[in-house]
């Protein structure tokens, strides 16, 4: 009996789907009257993550336009239409890295001072600035959420204050 009900229910669903698909509807799609309407896209962010820029510059990287002319990276990106910059900040990036893991950051790239330097450069060029807070000393993602070494033994209230201060 239960099997019969299941077969009957499946048949009813298939018939319902079949009959709705067989509609003889000749309606044409309706389009807005003014297809040439321009939309204001100025509120959208068109940007890049330049978190490693200061390190790349120190290592001697150069940035060029399509004609081969050298430019400062953030100016070049602005000239290409970017209006926002994303910057990653770690708590103490020189503490969370090791050569054994393949990560080594003795100069503390992406710490508060480094990020503030890049943020001021971006601000002076008219960029919108997006700060990506990593509440860790190194990469934080869903698979790896390590507290900064300096915060490891803090109570919950102390941890909340450390996050707010950061």
Please report, for each region that a protein language model flagged, where it lies by residue.
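Bacterial N-terminal signal peptides that target proteins for export
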Residues: 1-8
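Bacterial N-terminal signal peptides
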Residues: 10-17
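Substrate-binding cleft and catalytic face of glycoside hydrolase catalytic domains
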Residues: 76-166
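Hydrophobic alpha-helical segments
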Residues: 14, 45, 116-119
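Boundary/entry segment of secreted carbohydrate-active catalytic domains
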Residues: 31-76
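Bacterial Sec-dependent N-terminal signal peptides
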Residues: 17-37
């Amino acid at each position: 009996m239960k099997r019969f009900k299941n077969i009957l229910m499946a048949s009813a669903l298939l018939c319902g789907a079949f009959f709705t698909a067989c509609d003889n509807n000749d309606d044409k799609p309706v389009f807005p009257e003014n297809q040439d309407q321009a939309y204001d896209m100025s509120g959208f962010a068109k940007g890049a993550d330049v978190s490693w820029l200061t390190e790349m510059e120190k290592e001697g990287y150069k940035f060029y336009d399509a004609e081969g002319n050298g430019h400062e990276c953030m100016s070049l990106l602005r000239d290409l239409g970017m209006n926002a910059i994303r910057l990653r900040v770690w708590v103490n990036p020189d503490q969370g890295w090791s050569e054994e893991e393949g990560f080594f950051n003795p100069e503390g790239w992406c710490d508060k001072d480094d990020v503030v330097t890049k943020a001021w450069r971006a601000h002076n060029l008219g960029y919108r600035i997006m700060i990506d807070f990593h509440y860790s000393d190194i990469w934080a993602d869903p698979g790896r959420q390590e507290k900064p070494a300096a915060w490891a033994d803090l109570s919950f209230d102390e941890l909340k204050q450390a996050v707010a201060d950061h």
